[in-house]
Amino acid sequence: MSVDISTVKRVAHLARIAVSEDDAERMTGELNAILGFVEQLNEVDVEGIEPMTSVTPMKMRMREDKVTDGGIAAAVVANAPVTEDNFFVVPKVVE
């Protein structure tokens, strides 16, 4: 896949970025170089290799999945002018 100057201008327009003609030409070359590197990555044989979440093998530390109220509901609503059963009470704004 390669990028031409019209594609660079179109992407810049979609991203709402002002790009001069000189910058568009320069970016065309840079984007083509990046895409060339990505195409090289597609050639690597990864058959039988497990996906990794990190470059170093490590176990994810997981906590027990249990439902709690957090124990801080009263502290959260402590500064609110009006509360009811640990919920904020606000004036009705829509009829």
UniProtKB/Swiss-Prot annotation:
Q: Which domain of life is it from?
A: Bacteria
The EC number of this protein is 6.3.5.-
Keywords, comma-separated and alphabetical: ATP-binding, Ligase, Nucleotide-binding, Protein biosynthesis
Q: Which GO terms describe its biological process?
A: glutaminyl-tRNAGln biosynthesis via transamidation; regulation of translational fidelity; translation
InterPro entries found in the cross-reference section: Asp/Glu-ADT_sf_sub_c, GatC
Q: Which reaction does it catalyse?
A: L-glutamyl-tRNA(Gln) + L-glutamine + ATP + H2O = L-glutaminyl-tRNA(Gln) + L-glutamate + ADP + phosphate + H(+); L-aspartyl-tRNA(Asn) + L-glutamine + ATP + H2O = L-asparaginyl-tRNA(Asn) + L-glutamate + ADP + phosphate + 2 H(+)
Q: GO MF annotations for this entry?
A: asparaginyl-tRNA synthase (glutamine-hydrolyzing) activity; ATP binding; glutaminyl-tRNA synthase (glutamine-hydrolyzing) activity
EC top class named in words: ligase
Q: State the similarity comment.
A: Belongs to the GatC family.
Kindly state the subunit structure of this protein.
Heterotrimer of A, B and C subunits.
- Please explain the role this protein plays, according to its UniProt record: Allows the formation of correctly charged Asn-tRNA(Asn) or Gln-tRNA(Gln) through the transamidation of misacylated Asp-tRNA(Asn) or Glu-tRNA(Gln) in organisms which lack either or both of asparaginyl-tRNA or glutaminyl-tRNA synthetases. The reaction takes place in the presence of glutamine and ATP through an activated phospho-Asp-tRNA(Asn) or phospho-Glu-tRNA(Gln).
The protein's name: Aspartyl/glutamyl-tRNA(Asn/Gln) amidotransferase subunit C
Q: What are the top taxonomic ranks of the organism?
A: Bacteria, Pseudomonadati, Pseudomonadota, Alphaproteobacteria, Hyphomicrobiales
